[in-house]
Structures are given as structure tokens and as C-alpha cells.
Amino acid sequence: MVILPSELIGATIIYIIVYIIIQKLIATGSWRRRRLPPGPEGWPVIGALPLLGGMPHVALAKMAKKYGPIMYLKVGTCGMVVASTPNAAKAFLKTLDINFSNRPPNAGATHMAYNAQDMVFAPYGPRWKLLRKLSNLHMLGGKALENWANVRANELGHMLKSMFDASHVGERIVVADMLTFAMANMIGQVMLSKRVFVEKGKEVNEFKNMVVELMTVAGYFNIGDFIPQIAWMDLQGIEKGMKKLHKKFDDLLTKMFEEHEATSNERKGKPDFLDFIMANRDNSEGERLSITNIKALLLNLFTAGTDTSSSVIEWALTEMMKNPTIFKKAQQEMDQIIGKNRRFIESDIPNLPYLRAICKEAFRKHPSTPLNLPRVSSDACTIDGYYIPKNTRLSVNIWAIGRDPDVWENPLEFIPERFLSEKNAKIEHRGNDFELIPFGAGRRICAGTRMGIVMVEYILGTLIHSFDWKLPNDVVDINMEETFGLALQKAVPLEAIVTPRLSFDIYQSSEPF
């Protein structure tokens, strides 16, 4: 390995800085004649990067109060427009949706998503449409979700028995670990016809840590993404960590592929998701899916399918434990509709308006993705009289929209009843009502929206109905701090002691009846 002399390194850095400044001056001169949205000035070269801090969604929300619902920031050498209100989000994600349907290049897509060969980061085009279509048909769509409802019910049966056993020895429940175990097994059964984790322990903890690390790293504002000329330096060490993490996931996915292929004879007549995808690698739409595409898709589904929904459930339980009257009110509704002689089942959900209101309130106050995955403008455009240059990144502050005092009364309070009022009762979280867009909206709305809503409502409802919850004796108060990432995690995981409230035999079977 050749080591460059320090003088050459210094000269290179100076050259890059001068080049960037010249390019910026040229660009600024051409845009100055046009009306960009307001925003902070930022620093030379690095722009507004230092202003974002460790909690970018919070920093951007504060800036929006000063500069307005549509802001323009120079982040490094890249332009970024931020939408912070429902109307602003609607303008970008509905009116200008097609112009903002691509993703900007970034290190996460390159180093962790097989060079954007997945569904999340793939360019808007035939391959993305095919991956989306196959995922909806065989896993994420309404009919597919019905087909694997028994998998969700059986896995929750395993979870309830484990929690019941823990309650009898006074063992505390670590909510995030419990949810990761259950949800990874649900997804594993649908995709691979197997529970990927048979027992809690080192293996599942390592997987959870990998998922959390991926979602955290993917949410970082990596300097190299915004100043491509110095990306090779990896000043924050982020790309090095991404490559190391990708190797772990690739080893895991390779192992899953090999085990799945070895058991193909056992699935004759009962194909799973991976079987369907492999059978449709060559298709009439002219796209051929490589093994890399399929690995990348499985990575999307495993990580997003476990981490995002589990974070919303954990936040909902946290808010309810801080507000016991909400917990009791939810249990009373369930006792009237379901009783205590059977388990909670998915078909109960439409009959439980207060539970659904709790879930919506959790999605509002604690969206799993505080900032939508960035999009980029394919062409220059105009919005509300503002000029948006080509190749401008778009960030929608979903967290800020959910806490907008012009939209929500007492937005910092957890009040499920707000969704039972005439004003908000018809607001849904499926991408059409821009006051509540936890999954985004438009063409690039989260492909797992339906699954995410079902998972949160069903699992949270089961946990509320099946147990009484309290804090461990050594915990005086609940920590409500956030940790920023692609998914908004609790800084301190929720731990609780549970007490069964149903008949003993209900906890002993994986079947819902």
C-alpha cells in the first residue's frame, strides 16, 4: 500500500476545497436570479451540515419555525429542500410526485443495499416496479397478508407463552428484544418457511443489534454523501462500518439461501415467498432478477419489517405506561368486545376504535421514520413560487408534521381520543391524509404500509389484552429520550413486569382459540 506524502495530501485537500468553492459560486450566481425557498446560510463548503446536530429531525423542525414550511439548505455541495407541514408534503409527494420518485446516490445504498439493487433504493423504473409487484402479490398486499394470518397468530402464541413463563418467575420483559424475536420469526416463516430463531439468546440478540445498527447508520448524515469529492476519505468512518455490517448480513442471507435450497423437497405444493421470487426471476416484463437483487429484497423485508413496527409498539406501550388511564380504558374496551376467555384475534380490530386510536396516536407522535428516505428531483421545478433546482434532495419531516400545533391540539401530549373526534376520526395513516404520513406517500410510499399497520394493531392489541404492565421496582420513571436513525428508537429500551389477566390455558397454546 502506497502512503501519499503529507504535502500531497494537503495539496489535494486544498485543491478540492477551492474547486468546491468555485463550483458553488458559479451555481449560486445562476440560481440567485431565481427565487429559492428561504433557509439558513450555512458554512463555506460544508453548508448546513453542522446545524443538523445529532437529532436532525428536531433541528430541522426548529429551523422550519423560522424559515417556513418549505426550506432550502445547502448541505455540503448538495441542495436539500425540506417540507415540514401537511400542505408542503402534499405538494411534493402528490403534485410533484413523479419528479421526486428517485433516490439520491448515497453510501448506504452502495455499501449496505448491494449497490441499490434492492427495492428501497432502486431507481424508479422497471426493476423497482417488478420488486414492488412481487412483494405485494406474495407478502405485503392485502390478499397475501390474509394468507399468512395464521403465521402471525401462531408466533404470537409462542410470544405469549414465553411472557407467561417469565411472569411466573418475576423476570422482566425487554420489549424490543421480545418484539424482534417474534417479528423476525413471523417474517422468516413467510419468506423461508422457518422460524429463523428457535430460542432467545446470543443469535437473536446479535441479529437485533445488526438491525438496529443498520437502521441507525442508514439515518446518518454522511459527509461523503453531501461532498462527494471527499467521500474517499470517509472522515466519519461511516462507510467502513457499513461495509463491515454488510458482510455480516450477506453471510446471514447466504446461509439462509443455502438452507432454503437444501429443504426445497419439503415444500412441494407449499411454496413460500422466496420460492415465488425465484420462480419469477425471468418474467414477461423483461427484467431478470439476480441473486443479488433477491438478497437485497430479503434484507429490506427482514430489517424494515422488524425494526420499524417494533419501535412504534414500544413507544405506544411506553406512553400508555406513563398514562395508566389510557391502558385501563383500552383493556375495558377489549373486555367488553372480546372478554377474557379467548385470545385477541385480528378480526377484533375493526370493533376496537380506541385501540386503533392509540395506534394512530403512536404513529403521529413517534413515527418509525422521522425523516422520509430522501428523494431527489429529476428536473428543476417550481412550488409555491419557489424554484427547486434539478438534483435537489427532498426531505419530508414526518416527525415535525405529527407535532405541528397548527394541525394538532396539544401535539406533545399523547391523546388517543383526538382520533375519535369528528374532526380527526376519518384521518388514516395510509398516505392519503398528509396530516398523518408515518409511511410516507406517493409512488415511493413504504411498500410494507399494510403489513406495518396490521403488525402494530395486532401485536399491541394482544399485549394490552393479555397482560397488566408495570415498571420494575428499580425503575422510578420512564425515559422518553429518542435515538435518531432511519427508525426512531428509544434511547433506553422499555423493560416491564407483566401479569397475566386471562385464563391459564390461553397462554399454553400457539393457536388463537
From Swiss-Prot:
InterPro entries: Cyt_P450 (IPR001128), Cyt_P450_CS (IPR017972), Cyt_P450_E_grp-I (IPR002401), Cyt_P450_sf (IPR036396). Keywords: Heme, Iron, Metal-binding, Monooxygenase, NADP, Oxidoreductase. It is an enzyme of class 1 (oxidoreductase). Its EC number is 1.14.14.81. One of its GO terms (biological process) is anthocyanin-containing compound biosynthetic process. SUPFAM superfamilies: Cytochrome P450. Signal peptide: none annotated. Pathway: Pigment biosynthesis; anthocyanin biosynthesis. The keyword Metal-binding applies. Catalyzes the 3'5'-hydroxylation of naringenin and eriodictyol to form 5,7,3,'4',5'-pentahydroxyflavanone and 3',5'-hydroxylation of dihydrokaempferol and dihydroquercetin to form dihydromyricetin. Belongs to the cytochrome P450 family. This is Flavonoid 3',5'-hydroxylase. It comes from Solanum melongena (Eggplant). The lineage of its organism: Eukaryota, Viridiplantae, Streptophyta, Embryophyta, Tracheophyta.
